[in-house]
């Protein structure tokens, strides 16, 4: 059953860094990882941009490693092998964009 709940939220703001991730037509996913959650090494066929909102992620890619914290942005070209581990509960935004739609790759 479809329901619309009107008027329960009167204020909602989106961080400009998150808005900047939105393609002309598309979406941004919010992800929450519990402390200790590991996303093992993998790749994507599209460019990926992550913005850390809360917590800390140990982010690894072929040839590098870094602890990422709120405000950090990770730019991953298509095909980049990477993994992450939440060092504390982490919340981050993810945009997956075809290379032509990614302003960071143009």
Task: Write out the residue ranges for each language-model feature.
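A cytosolic small-molecule/anion-sensing beta-strand core signal
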Residues: 53-54, 69-70, 88
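Short, conserved beta-strand element in jelly-roll/cupin
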Residues: 33, 43-59
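A short, N-terminal "cap"/entry segment at the start of jelly-roll beta-barrel domains
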Residues: 1-32, 40
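Structural motif
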Residues: 49, 56-58, 65, 81, ...
């Amino acid at each position: 059953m479809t329901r619309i709940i009107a008027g329960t939220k009167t204020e909602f703001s989106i961080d400009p860094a998150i808005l900047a991730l939105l393609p002309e037509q598309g979406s941004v996913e919010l992800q929450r990882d519990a402390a200790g959650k590991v996303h093992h090494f993998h790749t994507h066929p599209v460019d990926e941009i992550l913005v850390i909102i809360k917590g800390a992620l140990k982010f690894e890619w072929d040839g590098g490693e870094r602890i990422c914290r709120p405000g950090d942005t990770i730019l991953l070209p298509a095909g980049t092998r990477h993994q992450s581990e939440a060092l504390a509960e982490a919340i981050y935004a993810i945009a997956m964009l075809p290379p032509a739609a990614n302003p960071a790759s143009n």
